[in-house]
């Protein structure tokens, strides 16, 4: 499984909707699909499944706001 598939699977599990797969430009925070607790869960899952550590201090909702942006950020950190 590649980074994109893994991140989308993680997001689908955390948000409980496949909308994150079908619309990768959806604003996760504005739509109420992610909150601060879900964000921590997302970062833990990314580290656990991909071995990529994302410091919480580097997490900015403006840059990590959509599934597409999250995939780009994770790929940049690998």
Swiss-Prot record:
Name of the molecule in the record: D-alanyl carrier protein
InterPro entries associated with the record: ACP-like_sf (IPR036736), DltC (IPR003230), PP-bd_ACP (IPR009081)
UniProt pathway annotation: Cell wall biogenesis; lipoteichoic acid biosynthesis
Segments forming domain Carrier: 1-78
The keyword Cell wall biogenesis/degradation belongs to this UniProt entry's keyword annotation: yes
Highest taxon of the lineage: Bacteria
Function: Carrier protein involved in the D-alanylation of lipoteichoic acid (LTA). The loading of thioester-linked D-alanine onto DltC is catalyzed by D-alanine--D-alanyl carrier protein ligase DltA. The DltC-carried D-alanyl group is further transferred to cell membrane phosphatidylglycerol (PG) by forming an ester bond, probably catalyzed by DltD. D-alanylation of LTA plays an important role in modulating the properties of the cell wall in Gram-positive bacteria, influencing the net charge of the cell wall.
Keywords attached to this entry: Cell wall biogenesis/degradation, Cytoplasm, Phosphopantetheine, Phosphoprotein
Gene Ontology biological-process annotations: cell wall organization; lipoteichoic acid biosynthetic process
Family: Belongs to the DltC family.
Organism encoding this protein: Enterococcus faecalis (strain ATCC 700802 / V583)
Cross-referenced NCBIfam families: dltC (TIGR01688), PRK05087.1 (NF003464)
């Amino acid at each position: 499984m590649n980074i994109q598939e893994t991140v989308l699977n993680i997001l689908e599990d955390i948000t409980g909707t496949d909308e994150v797969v079908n619309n990768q430009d959806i604003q996760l925070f504005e739509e109420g699909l992610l909150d601060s607790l879900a964000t921590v869960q997302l970062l833990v899952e990314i580290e656990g499944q991909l071995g990529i550590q994302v410091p919480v201090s580097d997490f900015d909702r403006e840059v990590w706001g959509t599934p597409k942006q999250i995939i780009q950020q994770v790929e940049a950190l690998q």
